[in-house]
Amino acid sequence: IGIVGRNGAGKTSLFKVLGGAAEPTFGSIVRKGDFGYLPQDPKIPGSRETLSAISHVLSGRQIDEQLTRIEKLRIQMEESSTAANIAKFSKAEDEFAMKGGYAAESEARAIAAGLGLKADRLALPLHVLSGGERRRVELARILFAGSDTLLLDEPTNHLDVDAKTWLLEFLRNYRGGLLVISHDLELLDEAITRVLHLDRPMEDSVGRIVEYRGTYSQYKTARAADEARLAKKAALQSKEIARLQTVVDRFGAKATKAAMAHSV
């Protein structure tokens, strides 16, 4: 689903509420399943700034914690190669492998690579990466998590042509729900099958949502037809109001003349 509307219509605010980053002014939100929310300017918690980029991606499925535990056991085993330490490390590694942990790590790296993040950059701590790289790392984490529903606000920002092509293919094949805000017309035409138009004339007014089925191009055609119909209706109403006002003015003038004649 593509979310469209003029600037200030409330698209980003709607996403914040749906994603749990903000509370609605009134009413309540009922969410089914889990949501993966990518804001325009994602904020990564300060406690994670020293972690590597790949660890942050893996945190989408909590795999980073398991890898950290295995790494600690490995260091412990190398420092003291007792039978107990070797057994602990082997057990943790076997459990991780049985749960598909290593395959999942390979999947996470493939997603990151698809978004244009090179392996050497993934090994660096988050705080040394550029803003564009950090946003791609966060997008990779959200895609890797495999949430029931994705909320993506301008997901193609900071992506080159190859990364955009990869993302489009990923979203086409995504099995969960997808809501997206984007100015990328190719994304809107290729990845969505419905459009929700946020119709909010003024920033302090209550808006409404109009649904259109089809791609963004089909929405544009249908929306133009709706606006033409509404403009024609408004013109007819204005014409009728003017006609009625003329009638009122005419009879008002006659009534005034009659009253003056009667007083004389």
Give names to the regions the model predicted.
Residues 98, 254-256:
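Short histidine/acidic/glycine/proline-rich micro-motifs that form metal-
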Residues 41, 251-254:
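Generic structural signal for alpha-helix termini and adjacent loop/cap motifs
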Residues 8-9, 256-259:
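Residue-level detector of intrinsically disordered/flexible regions characterized by low predicted structural confidence
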Residues 223-251, 261:
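Intracellular alpha-helical coupling/juxtamembrane segments of multi-pass membrane proteins
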Residues 1-235:
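ABC ATP-binding cassette signature C-motif
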Residues 134-135, 259-263:
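A short, terminal or domain-edge coil/loop segment
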